[in-house]
C-alpha cells in the first residue's frame, strides 16, 4: 500500500509538470506580420509631445488597421522611457510579429509637423500619410482630439513635467484596460472608473485629460484581440519590476496598476486556496477532498515552476491555464465558495453558475463557518503563545461579533414600534375577526371582546383605554371620512395591531433593565 501511495504521488507530480523546453527541434516560428512603431528620433520634449498627440488621434480612428493600431499603442506605451527603441528591442520576443522602428523628428514642411528621420530623403508625405493628415475620410473627431474636454485642441507642451503628467494620465487609462480586457470586458467599465477616481484623488493623473469612452473601447478591444500587444505589456511590467532602485513615477504607477492585472482569470484557483485551505477548517479531513487536495498541491507546485509569468498565464493565453480551472477540483471549489460567502461580503457578487458547482458542499462550507464561529485553533494558539484564558476571551468576543454580524445581515431590528395611520371613519365598523383576531388575543395574553360584541362606541372606548399614554394620535387623519371599505379595514387592522403591541409592552416587567426589541414583521405574519 505504501508503494501505491508513493507511485500515486509521483504520478500526480509528473502529470502536472510543464513541458520540458529542450528538444532536437528548433523554435517554432509562425508567419509574421510587420508592425511599424514610431519612436522619437531626438530628446526634444516637443517631438515627444507632438508624437503623443498624433498617436492618440491615430488610435481613435476607426479606419486604422489592426497592426497599425498595435504599433501606435506600443509607441505610446514606451514614450515614458529615455530610449524607447532600446526598450522595445530588449523586451520584444514574439514569434508572430516583426517590429520595425521608425524614428520621428520635427518638420515644418509636413501637415502633421513630423517626419521620418532619413538620410537626405524627403519623408514628409509618408509621415502625413501614416498619421492620416491627408485622408479626407478620417473622422472629424480624430482631427479635434478624443478627450472628454473638447476645449483641449492638442497636447503639445514644452515642459518636461507637464509632458510627464499628460503622458502618465493617458498611460494610466490604457494600462487599466488590461485588467479585464480578456477576462470580463463587458463589466470592465465600473472597475475602470473606480481606478480613475483613485488615481485622480492621488494626483497621479489630471482629470481634464480623461479620454472618451469610444477611444477606450477601441483600445480595450484591440488589447483583447491582439496577443502580441498583451505580450509586450506583460514583458514591460516584468522589466519594470526587475529594475533596481528608485523608478520613474510613471513606472511606479504601472506597478500599482499591476496589482489589478496579476492573476486575472485565476480567481477560482486563488480563492480556493484562500478560503478552502488557508482557513484550515476540519472539513478538509473528509475523504471526498483527498484527491482534490492532492491536485491542488500539484497545481501550486506547477504555478511556482512557471516563474514570473505564472500570474499572467490567462492574459498570455498559455494553454496550461486549463489545468487551474475549478473543474479540476469542483468539490473543494464549491466548499471554498461557501466559506468565502460567509466570511467576506465581497464574495456575494461572484457568479457560481457552473455545471460542476455542488450545492451540498457549498452549504458545507457555510455551516463550517457558522458552527466554528468563536473557536480558536489550538495549533495557532500554541504558536502565538495564547493562553487558555486568552483563548476563552477571544472566543467570547468572537461569538458576540458573529451574532451581531448575522443580525445585521438579516436586517435592522426596530427599537420602537411603528404603526400606520389610516383614513377611517369611526362610524364604519372594521372588518376583523377569525384567525387574525386570535393572534391578537394570544399576543396580549387576555380575553378581549370583539368589535361586533361591543359596538362602535364601546370598542372605541376600549381602544382608547388600552392605548399607551405617550402614543401620538393623528386626530385629523383619524377623523377623516373614507368611502373605501378596504381603507377602513386596513385602518382597523392597524389599530388592533397597535392594541396587541401595547398589551405586549404592558406585560413586560418593570425590573427589566433593557426593553424588549420588536420587529413589526413578526406581528404582520
Curated annotation (Swiss-Prot):
Protein name, per record: Nucleoprotein
Domains (record comment): Ncore is globular and carries regions required for N self-assembly and RNA-binding. Ntail is an intrinsically disordered monomeric domain in the C-terminus.
Protein family according to the UniProt entry: Belongs to the paramyxoviruses nucleocapsid family.
Phosphothreonine sites (modified residues): 279
Keywords: Capsid protein, Helical capsid protein, Host cytoplasm, Host nucleus, Host-virus interaction, Phosphoprotein, Ribonucleoprotein, RNA-binding, Viral nucleoprotein, Virion
PTM: Phosphorylation at Thr-279 is required for the formation of the nucleocapsid.
Interaction with the phosphoprotein: annotated segments: 477-505
One term under GO cellular component: host cell nucleus
UniProt-annotated binding residues for RNA: 180, 195, 202, 260, 351
Pfam families: Paramyxo_ncap
Principal subcellular localization: virion
Function of the molecule: Forms the helical nucleocapsid (NC) in a ratio of 1 N per 6 ribonucleotides, protecting the genome from nucleases. The nucleocapsid (NC) has a helical structure with either 12.35 or 11.64 N per turn, approximately 20 nm in diameter, with a hollow central cavity approximately 5 nm in diameter. The encapsidated genomic RNA serves as template for transcription and replication; encapsidation by N is coupled to RNA synthesis. Forms the encapsidation complex with the phosphoprotein protein P. Before encapsidation, the newly synthesized free N protein, so-called N0, is chaperoned by P.
Native organism: Measles virus (strain IP-3-Ca) (MeV)
Motif (Nuclear localization signal): 70-77
Spans annotated as Ncore: 1-403
GO molecular function, one term: structural molecule activity
Biased composition (Basic and acidic residues): 433-452
Location of the region described as Ntail in the Swiss-Prot/TrEMBL record: 404-525
Entry's localization field: Virion; Host cytoplasm; Host nucleus
Disordered: annotated segments: 418-525
Nuclear export signal (motif): residue ranges: 425-440
Amino acid at each position: 500500500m505504501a508503494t501505491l501511495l508513493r507511485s500515486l504521488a509521483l504520478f500526480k507530480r509528473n502529470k502536472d509538470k510543464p513541458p520540458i523546453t529542450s528538444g532536437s527541434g528548433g523554435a517554432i516560428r509562425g508567419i509574421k506580420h510587420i508592425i511599424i512603431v514610431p519612436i522619437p528620433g531626438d530628446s526634444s520634449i516637443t517631438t515627444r509631445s507632438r508624437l503623443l498627440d498624433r498617436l492618440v488621434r491615430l488610435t481613435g480612428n476607426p479606419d486604422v488597421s489592426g497592426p497599425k493600431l498595435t504599433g501606435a499603442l506600443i509607441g505610446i506605451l514606451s514614450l515614458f522611457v529615455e530610449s524607447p527603441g532600446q526598450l522595445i528591442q530588449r523586451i520584444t520576443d514574439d514569434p508572430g510579429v516583426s517590429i520595425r522602428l521608425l524614428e520621428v523628428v520635427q518638420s515644418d514642411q509636413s501637415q502633421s509637423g513630423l517626419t521620418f528621420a532619413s538620410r537626405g530623403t524627403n519623408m514628409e508625405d509618408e509621415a502625413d500619410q501614416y498619421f492620416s493628415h491627408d485622408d479626407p475620410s478620417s473622422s472629424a473627431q480624430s482631427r479635434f482630439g478624443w478627450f472628454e474636454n473638447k476645449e483641449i485642441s492638442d497636447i503639445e507642451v514644452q515642459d518636461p513635467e507637464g509632458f510627464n503628467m499628460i503622458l502618465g494620465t493617458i498611460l494610466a487609462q490604457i494600462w487599466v484596460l488590461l485588467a479585464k480586457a480578456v477576462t470580463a470586458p463587458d463589466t470592465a467599465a465600473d472597475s475602470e472608473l473606480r481606478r480613475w477616481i483613485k488615481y485622480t484623488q492621488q494626483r497621479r493623473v489630471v482629470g481634464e485629460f480623461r479620454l472618451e469612452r469610444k477611444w477606450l473601447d477601441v483600445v480595450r478591444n484591440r488589447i483583447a484581440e491582439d496577443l502580441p500587444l498583451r505580450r509586450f505589456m506583460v514583458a514591460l511590467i516584468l522589466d519594470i519590476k526587475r529594475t533596481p532602485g528608485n523608478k520613474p513615477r510613471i513606472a511606479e504607477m504601472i506597478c500599482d496598476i499591476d496589482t489589478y492585472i496579476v492573476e486575472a482569470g485565476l480567481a477560482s484557483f486563488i480563492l480556493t486556496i484562500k478560503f478552502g485551505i488557508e482557513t484550515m477548517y476540519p472539513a478538509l479531513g473528509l475523504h471526498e477532498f483527498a484527491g482534490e487536495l492532492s491536485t491542488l498541491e500539484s497545481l501550486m507546485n506547477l504555478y511556482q515552476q512557471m516563474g514570473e509569468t505564472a500570474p499572467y498565464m490567462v492574459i498570455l493565453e498559455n494553454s496550461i491555464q486549463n489545468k487551474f480551472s475549478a473543474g479540476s477540483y469542483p468539490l473543494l471549489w464549491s466548499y471554498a465558495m461557501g466559506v468565502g460567502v460567509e466570511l467576506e461580503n465581497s464574495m456575494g457578487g461572484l457568479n457560481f453558475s457552473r455545471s460542476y458547482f455542488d450545492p451540498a458542499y457549498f452549504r458545507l462550507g457555510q455551516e463550517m463557518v457558522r458552527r466554528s464561529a468563536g473557536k480558536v485553533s489550538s495549533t495557532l494558539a500554541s504558536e502565538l503563545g495564547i493562553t487558555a484564558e486568552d483563548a476563552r476571551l477571544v472566543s467570547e468576543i468572537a461569538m458576540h461579533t458573529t451574532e451581531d454580524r448575522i443580525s445585521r445581515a438579516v436586517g435592522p431590528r426596530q427599537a420602537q414600534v411603528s404603526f400606520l395611520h389610516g383614513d377611517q371613519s369611526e362610524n364604519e365598523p372594521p372588518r376583523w375577526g377569525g384567525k387574525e383576531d386570535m393572534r391578537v388575543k394570544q399576543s396580549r395574553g387576555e380575553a378581549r371582546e370583539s368589535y361586533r360584541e361591543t359596538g362602535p362606541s364601546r370598542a372605541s372606548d376600549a381602544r382608547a383605554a388600552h392605548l399607551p399614554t405617550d402614543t401620538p394620535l393623528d386626530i385629523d387623519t383619524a377623523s377623516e371620512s373614507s368611502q373605501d371599505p378596504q381603507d377602513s379595514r386596513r385602518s382597523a387592522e392597524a389599530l388592533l395591531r397597535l392594541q396587541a403591541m401595547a398589551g405586549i409592552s404592558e406585560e413586560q416587567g418593570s425590573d427589566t433593565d433593557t426593553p424588549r426589541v420588536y420587529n413589526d414583521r413578526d406581528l404582520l405574519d
